[in-house]
Amino acid sequence: MKTDFTERHHRFDQCGIAMYLDSENWLKGSVEYENETFQHLGSVVTNHGYSDWATTAIPADVKVLWYRFSRREDDYCIECSPDGEAFTQMRVCHMWEGAGRIRFGIYACSPEDSSFKAVFTDMKLTDCAWKAHDGQQPD
């Protein structure tokens, strides 16, 4: 899925992908604007109410990003790409309650006194692109 967040302008403006089971069990991958110099490419994983946040700084001039979200039973992978072709891993995680039915999709938020336009395009449901490894069910 492609995100265009050209119009973000306020600290903490963010958009990306999310998987939601309930308020105690969810994950997200996104870009969060910080300032004119950098922003955070990151993920949050919440299991049984406990969250962690993993980030890396990327230049603030990155305004378009693609995401790929994959699942193998109760393990999940979030990847990103500047062009929708060459994806790199952002996060692999285990969701303790994530083996059953899930809800997933897009999200955008501007948690401070602000708003911005995020554009989401090219969302596709495909076969799992995350290749199996030893001990996992094959494709």
What are these regions (language model features)?
Residues 1-139:
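Extracellular glycan-recognition regions
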